[in-house]
C-alpha cells in the first residue's frame, strides 16, 4: 500500500511542475503503477494475503516431461515471480464480490492507453487535455 501511495504522490508532484518535460507521460506511467499496486494490495487482502493469487502460475514438469497438476510461479528474466496484470486483478476482485465502478475502470483503461503509448512509442496528440479530463 505504501508503494501505491508513494507512486501516486510522485505522479502528482511531477505533474504539478510546469517546466518538467515529459510530465504528462511520467504522470501516466506512475499513476497506472499506483493503481496496479493499490488493486493488488486490495486483492491480497481479499485472499487472506496468499501471494499465489497474484502470481502467474505454470505447471511443474515431471521427470518424464509431462505436465504435473502441481503449479509453481512463472519466473521473469530476473528470476522473480511474474504477477498478473491490472485487468486480471480487477477481474479477480470482482469475482470476490467487490464491485468496481465502470467510471473507475474506464479511467484506469484511459490511463493505461496513455502509459502504453508513452512507453512503447509516443502520443501523437497532446495528452495533457486527456489527463485533465481523467482528473
Regions found by a protein language model. Give the residues of each.
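Short, solvent-exposed secondary-structure capping/transition elements
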Residues: 39-52, 120, 124-131
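Charge-enriched, short contiguous segments at helix-coil
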Residues: 96-135
Amino acid at each position: 500500500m505504501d508503494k501505491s501511495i508513494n507512486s501516486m504522490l510522485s505522479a502528482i508532484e511531477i505533474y504539478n511542475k510546469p517546466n518538467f518535460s515529459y510530465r504528462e507521460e511520467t504522470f501516466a506511467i506512475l499513476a497506472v503503477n499506483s493503481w496496479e499496486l493499490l488493486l493488488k494490495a486490495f486483492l491480497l487482502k481479499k485472499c487472506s494475503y496468499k501471494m499465489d493469487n497474484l502470481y502467474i502460475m505454470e505447471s511443474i514438469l515431471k521427470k518424464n516431461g509431462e505436465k504435473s497438476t502441481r503449479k509453481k510461479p512463472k519466473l521473469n528474466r530476473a528470476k522473480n515471480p511474474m504477477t498478473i496484470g491490472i485487468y486480471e486483478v480487477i477481474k479477480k476482485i470482482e469475482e470476490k464480490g467487490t464491485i468496481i465502478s465502470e467510471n473507475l475502470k474506464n479511467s484506469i483503461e484511459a490511463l493505461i492507453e496513455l502509459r502504453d503509448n508513452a512507453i512503447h512509442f509516443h502520443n501523437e496528440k497532446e495528452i495533457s487535455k486527456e489527463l485533465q479530463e481523467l482528473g
